[in-house]
Every structure is written in structure tokens, then in C-alpha cells.
């Protein structure tokens, strides 16, 4: 496995292009955009802004969030998905509401599948739920789940450990960085960040990524 550093503006630009496809080409307008916190927040905000402008003469698209977690750190995955809450409870959804569920990555797929199952339990139709991610990992070594992304910016096909990657989203992630990675991707671009971040990471950070 290798680590990829994905710039925030790449995610932003890709999200705008994907929003244009969904709206202008496919005619999909959600009633509710749910961002899966934390990872989906940046991309969901960009998509929401697109709809605010493109769909401004029609009913507003509600922006909401759900707090769900299955990852504990960069190398460990919990055995289950925890859903801490929704800012717009699924109980408030009406039959026929169109829902967009946004996350940064579909990796194991456990989080997305758990959230879609909850929405289905509240009577939503699967065809009215669109799963949107920046990165869709299709890993042949894993069991295929019932829910996969409807829209994605990149599809990453993984058949071997060497083909796998850990994607570091520079829009919102700091945990798990080595001293060398901090220097290359942060301090070299803005020297003041060294003064701010180095004390937080300490002197004992691993020098190698």
C-alpha cells in the first residue's frame, strides 16, 4: 500500500464537475443532501453550493449531516459502524424524497451501507437514494456489498496489496502524518505552519512515511 496526498482544490474541482453531471446531464435534484461527517463535509459543501446556484429558482435543497464512524485511525478499522446522530432525522423524510448521501471515500463500504440501510428502514426507496463519493475503491479481495456508489469522481480498482493506497485528504486530515510528510506537504509551502504544528506532533514522530 502507498499513500496519496490529494489536494483540497482537486476535490473541489472534481466535486463541481460531478455536481454538473448529476444536475445538468442526469437531472438529479435531491431534496436532502446528507454529508457523512467528517469525511464527506468538504465535498458535500461544494456540491450544495453548486445546487444553490444552479437550482436557485426552485425549491432549496436541504443540507444536513450524519455523524457516522467506522475508522479509528489510519491503519485500523472497527468491526462495526457507529451512527451518533442526524441533524435532519430520517423520521422527517417523506415518501418520494430524493436523497444524496456524500462521503469522501467508499473503501470497505460499511459506513455507506449502514446509512443506506437506515434510510431504507424509514421507508425510503433505494432508487431515490444516490450515494456520492470522491473515491470509489473496488477491491476484488473483499466481499461485494449490496450498496455501491451511484456517482464517484475516481474509481480505484484494487486486486493486490501493491495496488492499494491510503488517500490523505488534505482538505481535512492531519492524523497519521510523519515528520517527512509534514515537511513536504505543509511546512515547505508555509513556514509558519511548522511553528504551529510541530509542537502538536512532538519531536518523536516517525521520520518515514
Question: Language-model segments: which ranges?
Answer:
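PRPP-dependent phosphoribosyltransferase catalytic core
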Residues: 117-209
